[in-house]
Amino acid sequence: MSHEEKNIVVLVEDTDAFGRLNWRVFCRYCELGEAGLLKDLGFDQMYFYERYGISFPRRLARFEYLSQVFPTDTVDFKTEVKRVGNTSLTLSHIFHKRSKKAEKPLLTAKAEVVIVAYDEKNHRKMPLPKELVERIREIRPKAFDV
């Protein structure tokens, strides 16, 4: 199970002083991927908060940057569930850039983000919602084998 977005325009305001895509924008792309993945699983991004008071803050985010991205490029990315734990999900994000100079998309970055089910009322982590786990198991059972 994965969520993909393609041909995202790189805005000039999303670049750093040297004209490269700012690292913070990759974080935003990860959040877009998380929201898209939830939607693809059948859940609005606010569903678990509104229904159960559960949010999904990030516990860990690891990025590897492999190629610079500029405003003349577009970005494609794919987000997938890599691992399902008791209280957390590990998500994999793969980013490619499309450039006028290159024939094929070029791998530009990889990220791994761990999000944790968090009980907003009691201010502590909690088991992942059962319906989320069941839906992921239906679509991506290998995420439970890790």
Please place each PLM-identified region on the residue numbering.
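Hot-dog-fold acyl-thioester-processing enzymes
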Residues: 1-59, 118-146
